[in-house]
Amino acid sequence: MSRINEASKNVMRRAQPAWIATLLSAAVAWGGYPAAALASARSEKSHESDEVVRFELHPNPQFQRCLAQFPDDAQRAPSVEVTVVRGSQNDSLSLRGRNIKPGLKFDLFTVEHTNLAADATVDPAFRGNFGLATYQSDLDASEEGRVRAAIRTILLDENFSFDPTVALAPTGAFNVGFWFDDPDAAVGCGFNPQNPTPFNGDHKAGPLAMISTPDANTRLGPLCTHADTSTTPARCAP
């Protein structure tokens, strides 16, 4: 409910860039020194960077060739950009990808853990458990090799689930990834379709295709923008 309390603040934040521009213009017109105005503008820009979060998803290395539209062209490797805008009641996520093999279908999840390190290489400490996972959307690669998705839900900092019946405390899922919907789509890269993963509506999906990377210091995913490093491991502090 803390987002509702922020609603009036968000309205003022959206209005502030206009008066900042007016203040700068007035300072210059009157021959004044706009240092204070510039400092205010820089502060506003810094705050806006907290309201809009951008990050990339990276291919799961073992299955990149089965994912790629141009598997032999390193200059046209699969790429996906994610933009999340913080809202007063919920957040909006926009996903845009290209150079994906046309016709492939995927399933988008928010997950607790990623199998990649901060440099997008496979994390040697990963043991196959993505932790808490929530199904968010389907993805379809177009004839041009593009994928798009848009969702609205709680994503930044306050994204969590819990279940007291199994003693699961509130647990965040701050990574974003998507899985091959069809297990057979990744056979050419060594996936055994007789051992599907649960990452689609039928719980018979293929392997992970692309996923976000964690922060190098906190090891939290990009959906956490306020990390509390006073604890070990670090946790997200809304």
Protein language model regions, located:
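Bacterial N-terminal signal peptides
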Residues: 21-32
